[in-house]
Structure formats: C-alpha cells, structure tokens
Design a protein with these regions (language model features):
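Catalytic cores of nucleophile-dependent amide-cleaving enzymes
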Residues: 242-277, 355-404
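Functional beta-strand-loop-alpha-helix junction segments that form "active/interaction loops"
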Residues: 181-216, 315-351
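Extracellular pro-sequences of secreted precursors
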Residues: 1-188, 197-218
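Hydrophobic or amphipathic alpha-helical targeting/insertion segments
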Residues: 201-242
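Extracytoplasmic/secreted cell-surface and envelope-processing proteins
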Residues: 167-169, 192-196, 227-233, 300-307, ...
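Active-site-proximal beta-strand/loop segments in catalytic clefts of secreted hydrolases
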Residues: 85-87, 160-164, 186-191, 221-225, ...
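A domain-level signal for caspase-like cysteine endopeptidase catalytic cores
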Residues: 157-185, 252-340
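Extracellular/periplasmic catalytic domains that process cell-envelope and extracellular macromolecules
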Residues: 75, 150-153, 210-215, 248, ...
Length: 404
C-alpha cells in the first residue's frame, strides 16, 4: 500500500450459486467457527460459542465479502491482506450462497508514491527484494523494481556480542566479509548491556545508517541471555523479535538470529557448523536429500492437524519430484517409533520436522531430548530441525533443546 493512501474497493462483478442444503441431506445447522484455542487448554474448559441472534435471522449472513486488513510496515512497505469470504449462510431457509466469481478493483486515493519509493530505496536489500516480489501481489505495479546485484549492492550485517566472544567471532566475521557483507560488530561494553540499550542502538542503525550504508539486512545476537538479554520475555515465551522490529507492529524489518553460546567454546562449535554448511564442506553431502517427518502423540489434534501438516509437507515439498526422500512417521504409529527415529537422525537428515507436544528439554512423544542430542553420532550431517510444539526453544532456561 503506498504511503498515506486511502483504499477504496469497488466490486465490479460477481457470480454466485445458491444451494438448498436439504437437497444434499444436510438438515442440521452449520456449526459456527470457534475462536482459536491453546493446545495446552483442557478440553473440559472449552465452551462452544453460538450466536442465537444471528442464527434466528432469515437472511444470508457473511462477514464482509471483501475486506482489506492492514498488517503494518515490513521494511518500510505497508502491507495488508485481502480477505475474501465467498460463502453466505441463511440458517432459517437452510441455504448457502457461494460466490464462485468475484471481480473487484482497489484504488489508492491520495497515494504518496514518491515518499513510498524513497522509503523503499533507503532500506533496499536484495535479501528482502525476493521476499517482496514473491509474497506481495501488487508489488511490481506499485514500486520501481530492478534485478538484485549481489556484487554491487552493499548489504549491512550487524553483530551484537558480548566482548568475551571477540576472538571466537573472528572466523565468522572473516567469512561473512569474504562473502561480501559489510559487517559491523558492536560489543555490549560499548553500546550497553540492557535490552533497551541494544534496541536503541539497532533502531538508530536502521533509521540513520552511518557512512552511506543501507539499513541493515541482518542482525545477529551472540551470547546467551546471561550475556545479552532477550528483547522480550515478560509474560510469555522468550523472543528477540523486538530487536528486529523497528515500527512496533510485530513484523521483522531485518533478518535476525542468535548464537546463544554460553562461552567461546560453544560459539566455536556453532560457527564451525554454520561455515561448514555455507561452504558446502560436508564429507558426505548425500544426507541432504533425506528428511524426517514426525506427527507425534497428540491424541485430540494429531489425526487431523498433526498428520495433516506432515502430509501437506510431503505432498508439496518433500517428495521424489524434488529428489527428496521423506522418512515419515504419522500418528498413532509414531508413538512406538522412537528408536527408529533416533537411528534415522543419527544416519543424517537435512531437515527434521516434529509436530506434537514439547518441553524445554525436548520433544515429548516420541521422545527426543537433550540426552539424545548429546549422544548423537551424526558428525558432519547436521539437520535443520523444526518443532511445531511448545517451549523447545525457550533459550532463557539453561540449555534448551533448540540450543543443544
């Protein structure tokens, strides 16, 4: 959305079909959608919500047919979702109206294109440009675009570190500089040790980058929470999101990560693994074609959501069409497959995905915890692991599973 624009939506044409649900042997009311609930919530505490007033009206009901919902600024680009609700329901007549064709126009009134383009130019990053072009439907029609030039485009990479890691960081800084990044290292004894000090430093680097540099594309935090506090931890899961959100809308404006090392030895291990991946120096890279997909024991959710998520990944991404072999464990069989899963992980997998319950020290069922991780023999075959579960990356609680 261009800056300062008022969005006007005009419905140009629509085609719909009305269906009598009795013709399809549907004689009961369609249940209303329920609000989201936490997986940790007891089923006994969940109330079924039903609006008797709406269900008593003899009219077709739907939320706005087409709605624009603003999300915020993503690296100075204001973005929004177009939400389409193509089904209307009349509970009294037991009919639904389905819109199968919608043609509409969005117009941006009083748009300041120059201001929008200047903001984009100030924060241009080839690493965000590909995100914008593939994720924002009207991006190319609003902004001037160009091909990324990874040779000429300066990419700013900021490292925030505790000074105790200065020597251990050198190989990583040298490697990133060799790749072409402009690396700036700020030690907390210089900029301050509090979350506020760090956020203020990063905010200034983004708003007023020095020496004609662009706004940073990457921020790397080096140190565990004992050395560098998380940007957010009060009342919820620990997070560094605030360090990379400069417009207070929960959208990251830089790509942010953390080496949560407690000492230089930990950091050296993390750096060595990272550089090995980026230089493609594995002794046997054949493991990169193997993935491990696990829908764990989560009885009330696993049959639909756990298995569904794993099957979705396999159907669209992790399959022979992409030269990937997926070792898949669906619920309920996954519950008795713990030993087999650990064995496959030790053999090497590029990607491991688990969805079910978790805790700070690991995945719950089938169990895969810190003890298992510390005993692994997959040297040189390190996976990217994704846990769709609670607490496994709570990096403010000793050595959590994500850190181990």
């Amino acid at each position: 959305i261009p800056r300062n624009a008022e969005i006007v939506m005009e419905l140009i044409d629509s085609k719909s079909t009305t269906y009598n649900l009795e013709d399809y042997n549907i004689n009961n009311l369609i249940a209303p959608v329920q609000p989201p609930i936490s997986k940790s919530e007891s089923q006994n505490n969940i109330n079924f919500e039903f609006n008797e007033n709406l269900y008593g009206k003899n009219e077709f009901y739907s939320k706005d047919l087409i709605k624009i919902k603003k999300k915020g600024l993503l690296r100075e680009l204001e973005i929004a979702n177009i939400i389409i609700n193509p089904i209307e329901y009349n509970p009294i007549e037991n009919k639904i109206k389905v819109y199968h064709t919608l043609k509409f126009k969005l117009e941006f009134i009083n748009a300041d294109i120059e201001l929008s383009q200047n903001a984009k130019n100030r924060t241009f990053s080839p690493y965000f440009e590909s995100i914008f072009q593939t994720s924002i439907t009207n991006y190319n029609s609003i902004f001037e675009t160009r091909n990324n030039d990874y040779i000429e485009d300066v990419v700013s990479y900021i490292i925030i570190a505790d000074q105790s890691f200065e020597n251990a960081l050198n190989p990583f800084i040298e490697w990133k500089t060799q790749k072409g990044f402009h690396v700036t290292v700020a030690y907390t004894n210089q900029i301050g040790t509090s979350a506020t000090n760090i956020k203020n430093y990063l905010q200034n680097q983004y708003d007023n980058p020095p020496n004609n540099l662009p706004a940073p594309s990457f921020v790397l935090i080096v140190g565990d929470t004992q050395q560098i506090p998380a940007s957010y931890s009060s009342g919820g899961h620990v997070s560094d999101l605030d360090y990379c959100d400069f417009t207070n809308d929960n959208l990251p404006d830089v790509l942010c990560g953390r080496f949560s090392a407690q000492n230089p030895s930990h950091l050296t291990n993390q750096i060595n693994k990272t550089i090995e991946y980026e230089k493609y120096e594995m002794d046997d890279p054949s493991f990169l074609s193997d993935v491990l997909m696990i829908s764990g024991v989560d009885a009330s959710y696993a049959p639909t959501y756990g298995n569904g998520q794993i099957n979705y990944g396999n159907n669209y991404y992790f399959n022979s069409n992409h030269n990937i072999n997926s070792n898949t464990f669906l619920y309920p069989a996954s519950g008795s497959s713990g030993a087999q899963i650990l064995n496959l992980a030790n053999q090497g997998a590029a990607y491991i995905n688990y969805t079910a319950h978790g805790w700070e020290d690991g995945w719950a069922d089938p169990a895969f915890d810190n003890g298992d991780a510390n005993s692994m023999t997959n040297n040189g075959k390190y996976p990217t692991m994704v846990g769709n579960c609670c607490l496994t990356n709570a990096f403010d609680t000793g050595a959590c599973f994500g850190e181990t």
